[in-house]
Amino acid sequence: AYIGDFIGWHDRARTHFDSYAASQVTDVPATIPHPTQDTALHLARSVKKWGTPHYSNGYICRTPYRKDQMHHYDMNLCYIDELLWHFNWTGDLDYVRKMWLVLTSHLAWEKLNYDPDNDGLYDAYCCIWASDALYYNSGAVTHSSAYNYRANKLAAMLAEKIGEDATPYEKEADKILKAMNERLWIKDKGHWAEFQDFMGHKRLHESAGLWTIYHAIDSETADPFQAYQATRYVDTSIPHIPVFADGLDRDYETLSTTNWMPYVWSVNNVAFAEVMHTALAFFQAGRGDDGFNLLKGSILDGMYLGKSPGNFGQISLYDAVRRETYRDFADQIGITSRTLIQGLY
């Protein structure tokens, strides 16, 4: 959906957004309180029952124009992020008015599900590409909190423009940013924690993944020095993999998504979209040369050296187990368009 506006297909982008807005649940209030985890799945997912916090008003189902499908992913965050960028790029306030309830229902749903203790930090559940093997056990998570910070901040701005009350969204954005800086930013290391544990000693997971760094920067939770420090964490703590071939003018690099071991699908891959989003974060942090090197290294890796030249794939040939996987992968297409336009240009 990101790329539609870049190539002038604003109407096509709105068709996409309208189709999933029509999939947002609007007539199922949350009547079953937390916790509603599925015991048959060892409490790893919400039980699939209408009226639970997860499957209630605000939830966006997986198929266009279908409000009756339960799925375990929370793709609300990605959809709303794309929608907010569409508002930003087009300035179409009539469309903002049309989609206002979609946005506010989403924000209420996120708050109900992922910040029920109202501390300003959100749990994360199946809401990013890498989430298949991520689980935070109700912890306070950087990437989901950053997504919700940006959504509330922009909701406040949009509310003022269309005559709605901006106050609740301003307050929530301020609360999130304050909590992220006080509890998730590791001052002596210069980056955000992956998350803070909900139980026990409430320890910080200090080995953050790429998604922690780039989402926090992309959602504008960082000041300029924080952004620089966080990208230096990528330099020093995330594995760098050389990209080389006969005829290249110089050596390039790509990245693993984490430094975690052992290898597990979705949490320490070499994934094109993850590298591209990190490249965008480097551009946003004022490190354009390093961002360009990551961008070009990833393009060479997948679109030149890969088995399907010119294609936007999902996983790199440098991935230890999966190797090259999937073609025409939308995550990669969308974020590469943003990195080219908002980063390089």
What are these regions (language model features)?
Residues 1-25, 97, 101-108, 135, ...:
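Active-site core of glycosidic bond-cleaving carbohydrate-active enzymes
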Residues 25-71, 87-113, 157, 214:
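Active-site lining segments of carbohydrate-active enzymes
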Residues 42-69, 124-141, 315-324:
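Acidic/His metal-coordination segments adjacent to aromatic residues that form catalytic metal sites
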Residues 76:
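Periplasmic/luminal catalytic loop of GT-C fold multi-pass membrane glycosyltransferases
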Residues 118-124:
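Acidic, glycine-anchored loop motifs typical of Ca2+
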Residues 179-184:
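Short amphipathic coiled-coil heptad-repeat segments
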